[in-house]
């Protein structure tokens, strides 16, 4: 590139040769990390995006051509495809202003993604992972791209494929691999949901949010995709996946804190809402209530009519009340209640006393040793006023 051969390199990609595609794509891919490369010039003047889309379309032909027998793929075919996809991702990432130039590749990528078999042991190994990555930066808001991603004959076909990849991915990979491999799938699903027609959005909500069957147990304990996502939303060893899953579930809840609590339970929702400085329902029951404050009565009543689970769900755990296990315990005697009250009082005192010392420390320095002695006497007298044996 520094020698001025960028035009020749881009023209070389026109050749219907997997060897040329592999080598030239790899070379240009490596140069994208050099900030001195004029990517807009490569795309606008030397037709780099057009040539990449052409090569990807060539790879897609083998999946749409009717063949009596499926030929075994040439290893060079996949290697060249992977390099083209990696180059495409880097160009759309480092030069987002020209991401739209790669839109012609969208239908071909989707064909390959839906026709290729997905491994259960390594579902995001190349070329599946690079196919997903290549889709992330392509704008979906144009009419042609929406028609390609959500075809009228089967609007959910590509979403279902991504859901399948996601489910196999979170089952197959260890925690230390999830952030790198699975996060792009979640990011793409968020983008797809944002641009999808309403019927596709409803389908995604049905698949990715907990169902009534999931609520037969405490949310997150079933083996469905939705329950697995909930478990990973609190996994401390996968910070990127954890954050992306929570954000996706919040998006699926129409970015409404109340619906979010209804969908995933107060336990899973509270931490995410707090971290993002979003208003949290003051009471877990508020998310399911039908008689909130005067200003939200109409909304709560509407939610109650629209939600068949209203009044049937534990708002903290998300489990159906009728499926909760009842723990039968003998009622405490009066003496047991008093002993328990004393124990709690002692624990409370142990917690409060250090706070008293720290709070009054700033004033003691002005009152001198007499002030410190007086406060020490007050605290000690409170301790000894409790019953004998209460410190055990």
Kindly give the residue locations of the regions a language model identified:
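Intrinsically disordered, low-complexity regulatory regions
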Residues: 256, 261-392
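Residues within HEAT/ARM-like alpha-solenoid scaffolds
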Residues: 3-7, 15-26, 40-43, 47-51, ...
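Eukaryotic scaffolding regions of large macromolecular assemblies
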Residues: 140-319
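Amphipathic alpha-helical segments within extended alpha-helical solenoids and repeat-rich scaffolds
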Residues: 2-15, 45-67, 100-121, 152-173, ...
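Extended amphipathic secondary-structure runs
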Residues: 83, 87-104, 180, 232-244, ...
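Amphipathic alpha-helical interaction motifs in eukaryotic regulatory proteins
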Residues: 10, 25, 29, 53, ...
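Alpha-helical solenoid repeat architecture
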Residues: 1, 22-38, 79-96, 129-144, ...
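Elongated alpha-helical scaffolds that mediate protein-protein interactions in large eukaryotic proteins
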Residues: 1-23, 30-53, 64, 70, ...
